[in-house]
Amino acid sequence: AAPDFRIYWDNAYSIHHLYDENQDFLVEILEECTKAGNPDIVYKFTSTSKVSFPGSGIAAVAASKANLEDFRSYMQIQTIGHDKLNQLRHVKFFKDLDGLHAHMRKHAAIIRPKFELVLDTLEKELGGLGIGEWTKPHGGYFISFDSMEGCAKAIVAKAKEAGVVLTGAGATYPYGKDPKDSNIRIAPSFPTPEDLGKAAE
């Protein structure tokens, strides 16, 4: 890689587990880069945007000491100060890491049945047919569905004709360009269970 190559690691779903057991955890990339002799190659970002208030949460960055010093030198002239009242609101509400986890269990109780409904419908309608594969996530907000090659855009269009609006085909790829035109990101968290059941069928 080029000497100035950097990894910007968006760890948005680090505490978004659907289950109390059977949780997935990502490798601690900053630690691994440090072990490999490249501590300055990575910046890790996270926020409470999908925990408390969308677009109005508390953000955080983790990086090497050198990168944080560099980062602070820019930040101190880009802003006169962070929203300390919002920070205080978050601290008073969540209190600590246990408070965050307790809150996220409430999220999981709401969205887990929606995920299970979609996954059960996919298995019932498409299981064993060899025309699609899908993830069975333990957390986050999406199910990744892979259709047969060249079909994703057509599936999304047909679903829209039937009154079901899906995320655009290939949305998970850079610039939305899926070379196989097979990936659809399913987001079951927003609809009501009743609407979701109809849409999934």
Sequence positions of predicted segments:
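Conserved core segment of the aminotransferase class I/II
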Residues: 31-112
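Conserved glycine-rich beta-strand-loop-beta hairpin in the small C-terminal domain of fold type I
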Residues: 105-119, 131-146
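A common structural junction motif
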Residues: 79, 161-167, 201
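Helix N-cap motif at beta-to-alpha junctions
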Residues: 148-152, 191-193
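Short beta-strand segments
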Residues: 8-11, 46, 60-62, 135-136, ...
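Active-site pre-lysine segment of PLP-dependent enzymes
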Residues: 1-8, 12-54
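Short, solvent-exposed loop/turn elements at beta->coil junctions and helix N-caps
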Residues: 46-49, 131-132, 170-175
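PLP-dependent enzyme catalytic core of the Aspartate aminotransferase-like
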Residues: 38, 161, 176-201
